[in-house]
Amino acid sequence: MLFSTVFFSSPSYAEWKKVVEGASGDTYYVDSERIQKHGGFIYFWYIRDYLNPETNGDLSGKEYRQGDCKLFRYKILSSSFNKEPMGGGISFPHPFFLIEDWKSPGNSIDGIILKSVCSHQLSRIYK
């Protein structure tokens, strides 16, 4: 039941705030309403909205991540792809994309996202 809720919840109830646009033109958003801190970690949803459809027709991807702000690293807890922009339409979960180990993003787009979520300054994200 939880699985269905996670992957089929509507993005219309989220507060998606733009964080950064990549060199490819893809845009990255974080749901500012669902950022949570628990047990020394931060948990958040993010969407990558593709400028152009992927070869399989996906227009966006959505992930739920666990962040470690002290060590500047993250884990992917769930991952899905969508046939509509902004995580809309039917979600197709991709468990093989899950990373069991922590990943250090450095100065990549993932690093910009994690830094924004961890800093809580998020002038571009928070109201």
Question: Residue ranges of each PLM-predicted region?
Answer:
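Bacterial N-terminal signal peptides
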Residues: 1-6
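N-terminal secretory-pathway/extracellular module detecting exported/lumenal segments
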Residues: 10-64, 68-127
